[in-house]
């Protein structure tokens, strides 16, 4: 039961990251490009993707 909960957590986390990426892509089409010195648009999804990969490697 515990392993199933962990796998469900990972699947939900990956789905949230995928949705965030799609949402940002759609928002990026409407918005002007950020300045080259601003990495705010890529920091949050990169952080969650890194955490998801580390968690996946740790648990599986």
From Swiss-Prot:
Glycosylated residues (UniProt): 32, 34, 36
Keywords: Cell membrane, Glycoprotein, GPI-anchor, Hydroxylation, Lipoprotein, Membrane, Proteoglycan, Signal
Domain of life where this protein originates: Eukaryota
Leader sequence residues: 1-28
Record membrane topology: Lipid-anchor; GPI-anchor
Lipid moiety-binding residues (GPI-anchor amidated serine): 38
Propiece span(s): 39-60
UniProt keyword Metal-binding, yes or no: no
Disruption phenotype: Formation of abnormal long root hairs.
Chief place where the protein resides: membrane
Protein name: Arabinogalactan protein 14
Organism from which the protein derives: Arabidopsis thaliana
Gene symbol of the encoding locus: AGP14
